[in-house]
A protein has these predicted regions:
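Catalytic Walker B motif of ABC-type/P-loop ATPase nucleotide-binding domains
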Residues: 144-148
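The feature captures the beta-strand-to-loop junction immediately N-terminal to the Walker
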Residues: 35-37
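Conserved ABC ATPase "signature" region
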Residues: 90, 100-115
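H-loop (His-switch) and adjacent beta-strand-loop-beta switch element
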Residues: 192-205
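Conserved ABC transporter NBD signature motif
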Residues: 51, 55-68, 202
Length: 218
């Protein structure tokens, strides 16, 4: 089974750790949430897992997977603002050599057909987030990393996002999301990593766990 295993990991910049003592395993068929306040190190941890940043210390092991099976929506925006939603999909698909139907790809993240031909710069904040998700999903990665994907989404958008992530998980993939908005992700992840005050606490099973109590106690 594809997996990413982390042992005694410290992440940061220029050998200065931001978060230390990280131990967890990312398995396919799971949604994992990195939960913590802004600036806690969630994005730094994501970038380290993706191989974009060298760890300060510790080990990351990639089992039955490689960088081509990982995708991310981090450092927004990654889309082209002066291209339409449909053109964005076509350009990214062509770059990666993917055979993708742009209309179906945009439909899958609930971008309405009337917006497919509009320039991305004219999309609402929530619709831009959906486009970012669409582009990250094009390669059908085994490990999908999403940084604050709920930003700008209204309640209907959150319902749509949750359904999309669960469906992708149920296809046998791993989804890692980061957020600082506790109430908006309740019921979405299967497990959680609370990142706070330079530490990371992995909760592998959320059944019976009150995330609010745990989060505010750290």
């Amino acid at each position: 089974m594809p997996a990413i295993s982390v042992t005694d990991l410290s992440v940061g910049y220029k050998n200065s750790p931001v978060v230390s003592g990280i131990n967890l395993q990312l398995n396919t068929g799971r949604i994992i949430c990195l939960l913590g306040p802004n600036g806690a190190g969630k994005t730094t941890l994501m970038k380290t897992l993706l191989g974009r940043i060298q760890p300060v210390s510790g080990h990351i092991r990639y089992d039955q997977t490689d960088i081509s099976e990982m995708s991310a929506a981090i450092d927004h925006p990654s889309h082209f603002p002066y291209l339409s939603g449909k053109q964005n999909v076509q350009v990214v698909a062509a770059f990666w050599g993917l055979d993708v139907d742009p209309e179906s790809a945009l439909d899958s993240v609930d971008i309405v057909r009337a917006a497919h031909g509009r320039k991305a710069k004219d999309y609402s904040t929530g619709m831009k987030e959906r486009l970012e998700l669409c582009l990250a999903l094009l390669s059908r990665p085994k490990f999908l990393f999403l940084d604050e994907p709920q930003n700008g989404l209204d309640p209907d958008g959150m319902i749509s996002l949750s359904a999309t992530l669960r469906r992708y998980r149920d296809e046998g993939n791993c989804v890692v999301i980061s957020t600082h908005l506790l109430h908006e992700i309740q019921g979405v992840p299967d497990e959680c990593v609370v990142v706070r005050n330079g530490n990371a606490l992995h909760i592998p099973d959320l059944n019976g766990v009150n995330l609010a109590d745990l989060y505010h106690r750290r």
